[in-house]
Amino acid sequence: MAQTEIELDGLLAFPLTPFTEDLEINLDGFAENVESHIAAGAGALFVACGTGEFSSLSVDEVAALLAKAREVANGRVPVWVGAGGGAAGARAGVAAAQAGNADGVLLLPPYLVTGPQDGLVDYVRYAVGDTSVPVIVYHRSTGVFTAPTAAKLLDIPSVVGIKDGYGDVETMTRIVTTIRALGTQRSADFLFFNGLPTAEVSAKAYAAAGVARYSSAVHCFAPEIAHRFHRALAENDDATMDALLAGFYLPLVALRDETPGFAVSLVKAAARLRGDKVGTVRPPLIEPTPEQIDRLGKVVENGFAVLKGL
């Protein structure tokens, strides 16, 4: 697939993975979740990724989620899927994504160990193998790339972009500038994404660095707010962005930062507050306390009040 065929415009959604009371995947609930994202206007779906609790899922569960998402989407939006972890698992995941007709793969970092820069490129190359499914490399955690190393990813034909979850704008600016400066069609087409938790908080800074695309966890429970912010960013509407940041996103981040893992747990809790059947999180993530859920409800309520006043 030529890189110019990659369609990842608009707001990128990362569906939650619903679980039953005994923490088995709930495919019926997942189908409803996928449909709600599409109906709300998601530009693409990334299933079984960070927000979808990839680290807690088995290979068979990821395959089942991909198949269900493709069935529900029925070609209306692109469906990407997560892969990663240990080298063998990452390779198997990419191969399974291609076999399952995924539109692409978000390749998560190596599991547990941190290798040198050349080792990171080798990890991506090994994971990709002889597949041709498009791959976006997640730059975070045990997989943080320098700009020269990131440029080497362009030697792997199916790698079409980098998603930043590391959070260093200077590093990402170096990566974007280094790749664009190569002056080839390949480097001009290469895609960059802001993949930080609650990416709206850093969206203006990243857009200024040439990274306007981002994923929105808020789309899981308040797509109306997520789309209004996304439109404001595209229109350079600082007043709207600042109002939503002050009245909703920053209070949400303050609550999120109270407990490790709340970048996922709070999203699931907020989705439940809005009536979605997503269940709880798998360990080692934990659920918010009743007091935190009460505060979460007030944050979401205030967010919609701000939205109404715009």
Predicted regions and their residues:
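C-terminal extensions of enzymes
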Residues: 259-310
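Conserved, mostly hydrophobic/aromatic
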Residues: 23, 37, 69, 127, ...
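Catalytic alpha/beta core domains of metabolic enzymes, predominantly
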Residues: 141-252, 256-260
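A non-catalytic, amphipathic alpha-helix used as a structural packing/dimerization or gating element
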Residues: 29-36, 60, 64, 68, ...
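Active-site beta->alpha loop and helix N-cap motifs at the rims of alpha/beta catalytic domains
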Residues: 2-145, 286, 310
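Alpha-helical structural signal in soluble globular domains
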Residues: 40, 64, 68-73, 96-100, ...
